[in-house]
């Protein structure tokens, strides 16, 4: 697991209050990890802060799984 994946997973655990073992690459924030729309906004904000990047709203809407978050950060940081 890369340091980006580890950092993304840590943020997801902190923001959503889930167990680390529940954070799998294919896990959906809403369906699998129980996030609501506010949780996902806060999660994107935490990712922006951690990786010092800006995620436009239209891109943020596409980030719905753990892997999609990792892929976005890898491509834009």
Swiss-Prot record:
One of its GO terms (molecular function) is acyl carrier activity. GO terms for cellular component: cytosol; membrane. Gene3D superfamilies: ACP-like. Pathway: Lipid metabolism; fatty acid biosynthesis. GO terms for biological process: lipid A biosynthetic process. Carrier of the growing fatty acid chain in fatty acid biosynthesis. This is Acyl carrier protein. It comes from Alcanivorax borkumensis (strain ATCC 700651 / DSM 11573 / NCIMB 13689 / SK2).
């Amino acid at each position: 697991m890369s340091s980006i994946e580890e950092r993304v997973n840590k943020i997801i655990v902190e923001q959503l209050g889930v167990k680390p073992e529940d954070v799998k690459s294919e896990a959906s924030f809403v369906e699998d990890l129980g996030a609501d729309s506010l949780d996902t906004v806060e999660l994107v904000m935490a990712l922006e802060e951690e990786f010092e990047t800006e995620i436009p709203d239209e891109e943020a809407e596409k980030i719905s799984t753990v892997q999609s978050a990792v892929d976005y950060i890898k491509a834009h940081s």
